Amino acid sequence: MRINLFESDLERVARTLTDQFGVQVICQGDEAWTDGQRIVLPSLPEPMDDRLERMIVGYLDHEMAHVAFSDFKVVKEFSGKHPGHEAMLNVVEDALIEKRAMQRWPGVRANLDAMFAQIRDRVKGLA
């Protein structure tokens, strides 16, 4: 039952994003990313706890911020001119788009904080 409620909420947010930004939200694979036309989130495991739900919503907020604030043309041009340096640009861009998202949508900060805490805990578990 819990996963169905979360999936329902996620679908509602996805519909809002589609209406507002014209993007599609799908869950597949094990990474979160966007190309500006669609947002891909990791597949949803069962069962999910509250921390994992917040992490998925944090991913959605982060990728939504890319859709709202990234200039994909500039990113593509940079990648063409500076192959191998895309990760450096992405780090700077992530900080900028997340700051703008937190200013525009106040609830985003809590979701990003939860996402980073979950990622940090998973990385610590690998050490």
Predicted region positions:
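Basic/hydrophobic alpha-helical interface regions
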Residues: 1-127
